[in-house]
Design a protein with these regions (language model features):
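NAD(P)-binding Rossmann-fold cofactor-contacting core
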Residues: 11, 210-226
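Oxidoreductase and adenylate-handling cofactor-binding alpha/beta cores
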Residues: 97-110, 210-213, 335-344
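Long, intrinsically disordered low-complexity tandem-repeat segments
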Residues: 113-148
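Rossmann-like adenosine-cofactor binding region
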Residues: 50-51, 221-309
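N-terminal glycine-/charge-rich "phosphate-binding" loop or analogous flexible N-terminal tail
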Residues: 1-39
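Phosphate/diphosphate ligand-binding glycine-rich loop within oxidoreductases
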Residues: 41-110, 170
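Rossmann-like dinucleotide-binding domain for NAD(H)/NADP(H)
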Residues: 267-269, 273-417
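Phosphate-binding beta-alpha-beta segment of Rossmann-like dinucleotide-binding domains, i.e.
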Residues: 83-116, 155, 166-195, 199, ...
């Protein structure tokens, strides 16, 4: 019988894993060499450093991480010892895509993408400034999807005429105040740069394209067509979705450094849902203070769980590394982990790990009324399923509970299709 040591915070796994062998469940960050000495399999998450210190002298034949990321695994050591490993590519990609899209909806409602000259067209259907409601003119929202009437359908031919697709450089105020900004609460026509186009970046690109965004894909190792220079020149928002790497021409450690932000010409919102160390915390704070960006959306942090208090205060959305924490993504990761074990040992075992159903009338935290009147119903429906401001409020109230908030994350679902 197989002996498995399993991170006790991996959801939906206990009953299913018992079909594979004898299971021991332990806190991921507390798993020791003694714990795994007699184990055949280690199933973990990113909080367990899988290396020589942990595995030397053990019987472990297979390491599985129930995550997309795998920089916590010393793969060179595992290869040296002939220990196999698997991750769960794409398991929570749609969850991260949901996080990015919903964060951009909130940024749009806050006025982060608005300029006075960009919020009206020639027939003077314009948005009011400050915290006032939209103008009462019934043309303020279009009848088909509740989008802002100032927009036109998104096509390659007319993208350049959309409110968010103008290519001129706009001077930023160092003290952007969303309460005094004109706004256009739509994602249609935004140009969004995605850095890192693996499973997650691809899912983000797809969900934003469905909202009418123009997407610039930047991933030099994959031969994607756009560069960081292109994104700096054209993107209204930039979202990081790379692994963390330290060597080579395309190393991603501090990819978003001071020079990255200095080169931005029109970017309003910066998002890090990759790894914390892909962005230099001091550089992000500088960019906010100097008006190089208007808002930061930070899900991954340097030095987790001991995160920057100043960036926590300054970010528009600040969450404890939970962008991929939908129940759907977790269920996918658990299923893929168990299937990897079964395949490795030649076991005839298949796993169906359904995500829990939502209760009737489910709402993932209420939106402020100052935002709800700025958003179309389609956006509000998405935000009822997941509102990242709720996670932000929770983290700001108790940043010392970073790990507990991850380990005891509330029920969240992706779109129910």
């Amino acid at each position: 019988m197989l002996r498995l040591v399993i991170d006790d915070k991996i959801p939906f796994i206990r009953e299913a894993a018992a079909r594979l062998g004898e299971c021991v469940f332990l806190p991921g960050a507390a798993i020791t060499a003694d714990d795994v000495r007699e184990a055949d399999v280690l199933i973990t998450r990113t909080r367990t450093q899988v290396n020589r210190a942990l595995l030397e002298g053990s019987k472990v034949q297979l390491v599985v991480t129930a995550t997309i990321g795998h920089d916590h695994i010393d793969k060179a050591y595992l290869a040296e010892k002939g220990i196999a490993w698997h991750n769960c590519p794409g398991c929570n990609a749609r969850s991260v895509a949901q996080y990015v899209r919903n964060s951009l909806w909130i940024a749009a409602a806050k006025g982060c993408f608005a300029e006075g000259e960009r919020c009206f067209n020639t027939d003077e259907r314009r948005f009011e400034a400050n915290e006032r409601d939209f103008a009462t003119d019934e043309r303020a929202f279009s009848t088909n999807e509740g989008e802002c009437a100032a927009n036109v359908p998104t096509t390659d031919k007319n993208l350049g005429n959309l409110p968010h697709s103008m290519t001129h450089n706009v001077a930023f105020s160092k003290a952007f105040d969303p309460t005094n900004a004109p706004f256009c609460a739509t994602l249609r026509g935004l140009t969004v740069g995605i850095v890192g186009v693996g499973h997650v970046g691809t899912a983000v690109a797809e969900i934003l394209a469905a909202e009418g965004c123009r997407v610039l894909r930047c991933d030099p190792p994959k031969g994607e067509p756009h560069t960081l220079v292109d994104l700096a020149r054209e993107a209204d928002a930039i979202s990081l979705h790379t692994p963390l790497t330290f060597e080579g021409e395309h190393a991603t450690f501090h990819l978003a450094d001071r020079s990255f932000f200095e080169n931005l010409q029109r970017c309003r919102v910066f998002i890090n849902a990759a790894r914390g160390e892909c962005a230099d915390t001091a550089a992000v704070e500088w960019a906010l203070s100097e008006g190089k960006i208007r808002a930061a959306v930070i899900d991954t942090w340097e030095n987790e769980p001991h995160i920057s208090a100043s960036l926590l205060r300054a970010a528009l959305i600040a969450t404890p590394h939970v962008a991929g924490y939908s129940a759907d993504g977790k269920a996918n990761g658990t299923r893929m982990s168990l299937e990897a074990v079964a395949r490795h040992f030649g076991l005839d075992a298949h796993f169906d790990i359904p995500a829990p159903a939502l209760p009737a009338g489910f709402v993932y935290g209420a939106l402020p009324t100052t935002l709800t009147h700025r958003l179309p119903e389609r956006a509000l429906a998405q935000l009822r399923l997941y509102n990242p401001l709720t996670d932000t409020d929770r983290l700001r109230a108790a940043p010392e509970d970073f790990e507990q908030q991850r380990g005891n994350y509330p029920l969240r679902r992706e779109e129910i299709r």
